[in-house]
C-alpha cells in the first residue's frame, strides 16, 4: 500500500499536496478506490482510499486511524560531519530504525564544514530524504534534521539527554548492553559518532564531563556511517522496539 503525506484532514477526508498528487497520478497511476496510507507528518496515519480526482487534485477518504508506530525511546544521533553523501545514508537508515533526530556537528577532525547557506541546503536535502524514507517504511513521524552545529552548541544539547552514549574505538570493555543493564528506563538517548578522523581526546573529556558514557562496538573499527547505524540499531533493540 502506497503512503502519502496529506494536508490537514477535514470531515474524514484530506487533499494530497500538489507534489504528492502528481506522484499518485503520473507515476503510480492510482484511481478512485485504490487503497493508500495517509500520513500528516506529525505522527498520525490512516488507512484510506482515493476518493476523487479532479484535474490534478486528489482527495483521500480516511477510513481508519492506524496505531502509532513511533519508538518508545527518543533517539538523537550527533554525527561528526562526514565527507560526500554519507549523511544521506545515515538519515535514511535512522528514519527506518525509528530515530527521532539527526544533528550534524562540526567536530575537530571534520573535513567538511557546511557553514551558512551550504549548511541550510544540506539540512533541507536531508529532511527530504527523511520524509521519503518515512513514506517507504510506513512511519508517521519523519526524522527531524538539525542544521549543522558548532561543537559548543552541540555539547549543550548533549548534556540534556537522560543518557549520552559515545561509541569510541579506544573504549574498552563497556558495551551497550552493559549500559542498558544499569539504565533500562532511559527514554531520551543521545549517541555521538565521530567523523572519519575520529573523536579527539579533548572532545571525549568534555563529553564524559557532561555525563557521556564511552562504549565499544567491538574489536573492529567501523566506518562513521556504519557506526551511526549500528549504534542506533542496538539502542532500538535494547531500549526500543526492534
Locate the predicted segments by residue:
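RNA substrate-binding interface of SAM-dependent RNA methyltransferases
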Residues: 67-165
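Generic structural signal for residues in well-ordered beta-strands
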Residues: 36, 60, 142-146, 214
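Structured adenosyl-cofactor binding patch, chiefly the S-adenosyl-L-methionine
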Residues: 201-242
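Residue-level signal for inorganic ion chemistry
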Residues: 33, 94, 130, 207, ...
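Short, hinge-like loop/turn segments at secondary-structure boundaries
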Residues: 120-123, 182, 233-234
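N-terminal positively charged helical leader segments and presequences
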Residues: 1-68
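Active-site/ligand-binding-proximal alpha/beta "capping" segment
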Residues: 162-204, 212-216
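Mobile, glycine- and charge-enriched loop segments
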Residues: 36, 61, 69, 73-78, ...
Amino acid at each position: 500500500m502506497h503512503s502519502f503525506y496529506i494536508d490537514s484532514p477535514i470531515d474524514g477526508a484530506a487533499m494530497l499536496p500538489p507534489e504528492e498528487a502528481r506522484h499518485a497520478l503520473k507515476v503510480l497511476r492510482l484511481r478512485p478506490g485504490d487503497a493508500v496510507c495517509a500520513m500528516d507528518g506529525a505522527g498520525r496515519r490512516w488507512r484510506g482510499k482515493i476518493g476523487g480526482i479532479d484535474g490534478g487534485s486528489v482527495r483521500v477518504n480516511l477510513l481508519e486511524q492506524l496505531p502509532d508506530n513511533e519508538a518508545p525511546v527518543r533517539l538523537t544521533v550527533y554525527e561528526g560531519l562526514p565527507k560526500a553523501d554519507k549523511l544521506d545514508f545515515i538519515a535514511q537508515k535512522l528514519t527506518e530504525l525509528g530515530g527521532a533526530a539527526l544533528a550534524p556537528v562540526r567536530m575537530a577532525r571534520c573535513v567538511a564544514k557546511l557553514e551558512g547557506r551550504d549548511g541550510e541546503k544540506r539540512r533541507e536535502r536531508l529532511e527530504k530524504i527523511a520524509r521519503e524514507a518515512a513514506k517507504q517504511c510506513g512511519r508517521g513521524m519523519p526524522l527531524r534534521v538539525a542544521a549543522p552545529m558548532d561543537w559548543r552548541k552541540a555539547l549543550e544539547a548533549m548534556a540534556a539527554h537522560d543518557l549520552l552514549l559515545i561509541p569510541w574505538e579506544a573504549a574498552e570493555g563497556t558495551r551497550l548492553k552493559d549500559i542498558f543493564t544499569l539504565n533500562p528506563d532511559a527514554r531520551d538517548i543521545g549517541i555521538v559518532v565521530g567523523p572519519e578522523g575520529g573523536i579527539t581526546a579533548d572532545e571525549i573529556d568534555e563529553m564524559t564531563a557532561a555525563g557521556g558514557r564511552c562504549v565499544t562496538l567491538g574489536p573492529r573499527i567501523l566506518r562513521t556511517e556504519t557506526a551511526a547505524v549500528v549504534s542506533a540499531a542496538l539502542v532500538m533493540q535494547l531500549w526500543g522496539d526492534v
